[in-house]
């Protein structure tokens, strides 16, 4: 409000015209959803989980090599007999222990072996009370 003394007095007494500000309703900005771009971070390598279903003891060294390279390994022993399964589990348990890794029993015939650099959280309550060293009972 530009004016002199008289305008200020009239304004004080309530006789001046008030300037109304125009209310402009703004339209909400439209959300632009583009395709997400996945970018690999430098220095971060992709973690690859390996799944094995061995048929003979000869395959166990390849499974151990995957653990040594830092990959978590799922081993399915459903198609082999109990004695061979015990030998495979014993070998992989030794490998996992030597690497400072972890073993998680998913069910009586499926195991998850994880190297030291992989953290596995949670627990399978159904199997936690069963003996660890004889998984084929």
Swiss-Prot record:
Gene name of the record: sepF
Give the record's family classification: Belongs to the SepF family.
Assembly with partners or alone: Homodimer. Interacts with FtsZ.
Q: Which protein is depicted?
A: Cell division protein SepF
Q: Which GO terms describe its biological process?
A: division septum assembly; FtsZ-dependent cytokinesis
The record's GO CC annotations read: cytoplasm
Subcellular location per UniProt equals: Cytoplasm
Give the Gene3D superfamilies listed for this entry: SepF-like protein (3.30.110.150)
Q: Which InterPro entries match?
A: Cell_div_SepF, Cell_div_SepF/SepF-rel, SepF-like_sf
Which key words are in the record?
A: Cell cycle, Cell division, Cytoplasm, Septation
Q: What does this protein do?
A: Cell division protein that is part of the divisome complex and is recruited early to the Z-ring. Probably stimulates Z-ring formation, perhaps through the cross-linking of FtsZ protofilaments. Its function overlaps with FtsA.
Native source organism of the sequence: Carboxydothermus hydrogenoformans (strain ATCC BAA-161 / DSM 6008 / Z-2901)
């Amino acid at each position: 409000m530009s004016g002199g003394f008289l305008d200020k007095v009239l304004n004080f007494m309530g006789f001046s015209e008030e300037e109304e500000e125009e209310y402009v309703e703004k339209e909400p900005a439209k959300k632009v959803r583009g395709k997400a771009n996945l970018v690999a971070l430098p220095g971060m390598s992709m973690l690859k989980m390996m799944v094995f279903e061995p048929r003979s003891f000869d395959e166990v060294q390849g499974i151990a090599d995957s653990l040594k390279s830092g990959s978590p390994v799922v081993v399915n022993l459903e198609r082999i007999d109990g004695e061979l399964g015990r030998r495979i589990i014993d070998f992989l348990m030794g490998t996992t222990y030597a690497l400072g890794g972890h073993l998680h029993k998913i069910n009586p015939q499926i195991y998850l072996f994880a190297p030291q650099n992989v953290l596995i959280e949670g627990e399978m309550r159904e199997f936690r009370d069963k003996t660890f060293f004889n998984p084929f009972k």
